[in-house]
């Protein structure tokens, strides 16, 4: 068990999803008191989104992780107004949340060329500074990557999430018959006949206690924050992490996964959710499916079997429940159709909400 944990840490270390950098705006230029000349303002430091950039590439390219903008030009006889210092741009991947040392969000990079100002340059010397320049702002900045996708796959290890991703998209994640095969987020796209594309993120499997960062839970759970919908993937035969951990039925895994999301961030429970019940090719799968459906239809009749701390405050209501087999392909086409339908419905609701908001703004301004 310890050996597995060490391997997980080593391999996951190759994928960087958080980077701490030092930034400093440029100092202002000297003023020219005799002629009233003003020094140029120091350059600013910006974090800018680049499509093909990764945090690992950023770290390798700038191992010191220091980004300092240029100083403003001094005022002189031939140029009384000093020119502004050169800005410094920090290239970062799309999907970055930029925060300071106190956790305050400075901005987000949701698409290519989005930019966030992280350190301002100092003022140039002028009358109210006695023509003395000011230093630029210093700031420690955290770049936190959160995968952006339409659908995020949620499940315990070895539930078949990677196999499902390879079935519904052209992604080629590592697939094996043991836990923790996926050690970093994998992205794939579902392609439809009308050229519609839906992005799907396969996240490393969660374990009980993920909300407390067990099994790197925080590294994994945070990637669900920017997905529009959740797709739970559950093994119909249940789950057991190891011989020393309790066996969980399919129903128990759903309850526990819901609780983990709730304890990490309650907002995750407000996301629309679907359920894929995997491994329907196994013996007795149909019998277990009938039992699971009965439990899902009336969960309150079975929650007394759980410890109080394991019961979520609010049970998730799945928009669609689809039995599948990633081995035989059973239910895959239906699942893709349900994913499309659920997202189309969500698009419609978001459009209606946007139109209502615009109408209210027009009414209040008239």
Curated annotation (Swiss-Prot):
It comes from the Eukaryota. GO terms for biological process: ribosome biogenesis. Belongs to the TRAFAC class OBG-HflX-like GTPase superfamily. OBG GTPase family. Pfam families: GTP1_OBG, MMR_HSR1. One of its GO terms (cellular component) is nucleolus. It comes from Mus musculus (Mouse). InterPro entries: G_OBG, GTP-bd, GTP-bd_Obg/CgtA, GTP1_OBG_dom, GTP1_OBG_dom_sf, OBG_GTPase, P-loop_NTPase. Residues 149-344 form the OBG-type G domain. GO terms for molecular function: GTP binding; GTPase activity; magnesium ion binding. GTP binds at residues 155-162, 202-206, 278-281. It is found in: Nucleus, Nucleolus. The gene is Gtpbp10. SUPFAM superfamilies: Obg GTP-binding protein N-terminal domain, P-loop containing nucleoside triphosphate hydrolases. Its main location: nucleus. Keywords: GTP-binding, Nucleotide-binding, Nucleus, Ribosome biogenesis. Residues 346-366 are annotated as: Disordered. Residues 13-148 form the Obg domain. This is GTP-binding protein 10. May be involved in the ribosome maturation process. Residues 346-355 have a biased composition (Basic and acidic residues).
């Amino acid at each position: 068990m310890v050996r597995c944990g060490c391997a997980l840490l080593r391999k996951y270390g190759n994928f960087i999803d958080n980077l701490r950098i030092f930034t400093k705006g440029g100092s202002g230029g000297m003023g020219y008191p005799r002629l009233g000349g003003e020094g140029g303002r120091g350059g600013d430091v910006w974090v800018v989104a680049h499509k093909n950039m990764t945090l690992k590439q950023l770290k390798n390219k700038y191992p010191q992780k220091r980004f300092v903008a240029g100083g403003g030009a001094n005022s002189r006889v031939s140029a009384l107004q000093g020119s502004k210092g050169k800005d410094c741009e920090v290239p970062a991947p799309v999907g970055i949340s930029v925060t300071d040392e106190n956790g305050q969000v400075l901005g987000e990079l949701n698409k290519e060329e989005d930019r966030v100002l992280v350190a301002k340059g100092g003022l140039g010397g002028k009358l109210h500074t006695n023509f003395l320049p000011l230093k630029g702002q210093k700031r420690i900045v955290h770049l936190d990557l959160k995968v952006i996708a339409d659908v995020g796959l949620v499940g315990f290890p070895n539930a078949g999430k990677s196999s499902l991703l390879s079935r519904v998209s052209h992604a080629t994640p590592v697939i094996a018959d043991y836990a923790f095969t996926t050690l970093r987020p994998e992205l794939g796209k579902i392609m439809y006949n009308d050229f519609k594309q839906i992005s799907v993120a396969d996240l490393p499997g969660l374990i009980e206690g993920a909300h407390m960062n067990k099994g790197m839970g925080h590294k994994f759970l945070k990637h669900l924050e920017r997905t529009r919908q959740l797709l739970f993937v559950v093994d119909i035969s249940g789950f057991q992490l190891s011989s020393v951990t309790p066996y969980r039925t399919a129903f128990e895994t759903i309850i526990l996964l819901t609780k983990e999301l709730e304890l990490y961030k309650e907002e995750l429970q407000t996301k629309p959710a679907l359920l894929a019940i995997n491994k329907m090719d196994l013996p007795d799968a149909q019998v277990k499916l009938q039992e699971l459906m009965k439990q899902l239809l009336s969960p309150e009749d079975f929650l007394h079997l759980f410890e109080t701390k394991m019961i979520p405050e609010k049970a998730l209501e799945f928009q669609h429940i689809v039995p599948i087999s990633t081995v035989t392909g059973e239910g895959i086409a239906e699942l893709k159709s349900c994913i499309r339908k659920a997202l189309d419905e969500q698009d419609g609701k978001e459009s209606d909400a946007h139109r209502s908001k615009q109408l209210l703004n027009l009414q209040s301004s008239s």
